[in-house]
From Swiss-Prot:
Belongs to the bacterial ribosomal protein bL9 family. The keyword Ribonucleoprotein applies. This is Large ribosomal subunit protein bL9. Binds to the 23S rRNA. Residues 172-192 are annotated as: Disordered. PROSITE patterns: RIBOSOMAL_L9. The gene is rplI. One of its GO terms (biological process) is translation. It comes from Rhizobium leguminosarum bv. trifolii (strain WSM2304). GO terms for cellular component: ribonucleoprotein complex; ribosome. It comes from the Bacteria.
Length: 192
């Protein structure tokens, strides 16, 4: 089906272009959401008559998204979740959670604007892409940790999955005095 795009759609085209799309995509997504019109003579003249208002509305949306992007871009958010000793989360951080975190900070972002290929399932620093407008894309950082103190340590570059980081204990001090380590330096091969 041929449609006239009423706004820029990534990987499809710019506003005003006539593009060929699958019937289901047009009927179930583009037409109901007002992102496109069927490409016929009547709709082409209608689009040309409304082109100036559509461009003004698109520019207004883009400027609003750019204002939010200027505040959010590169910002870091702390996410406290339960996790095991290896750093594996008991659950995950999904797009829904990112939206809730941003809403708590006063930003109104839709779930469809958060681009996570897979949910976050481990503690650490994770970059998340936000598509605020078809032409405005930013990244925020999620600092996923077991506590606020760990998040602070993690933001300074500390590794939190070792025994020392978890318990505050030196691993070497836990070894018995007569512990034999075949990989340690100074072991004479004749003795072994």
């Amino acid at each position: 089906m041929d449609v006239i795009l009423l706004e820029r759609i990534s990987k499809l085209g710019q506003m005003g272009e006539t593009v060929k799309v699958r019937d289901g995509f047009a009927r179930n997504y583009l037409l109901p959401l007002g992102k496109a019109l069927r490409a016929n003579a009547a709709n082409k003249t209608r689009f040309e008559a409304e082109r100036a208002t559509l461009e003004a509305r698109n520019l207004e949306r883009k400027s609003e998204a750019q204002k939010v992007a200027d505040v959010l871009d590169g910002k870091s958010f702390i996410v406290v979740r339960s996790a095991g000793e290896t750093g594996q989360l008991y659950g995950s951080v999904a797009a829904r959670d990112v939206v809730e975190i941003l809403a708590a900070e006063g930003f109104n972002i839709g779930r469809n604007q958060v681009h996570l290929n897979t949910p976050i399932k481990a503690i650490g620093l994770h970059k998340v892409e936000l598509q605020l407008h078809a032409e405005v894309e930013i990244h925020v950082e999620l600092n996923v940790a077991r506590s606020a103190e760990e998040a602070e340590r993690q933001s300074k570059g500390e590794e939190l999955t070792s025994v020392d980081a978890i318990y505050g204990v030196d691993e070497d001090a836990l070894r018995p005095e007569d512990f034999f380590d075949p990989e340690a330096d100074g072991v004479d091969e004749d003795e072994a």
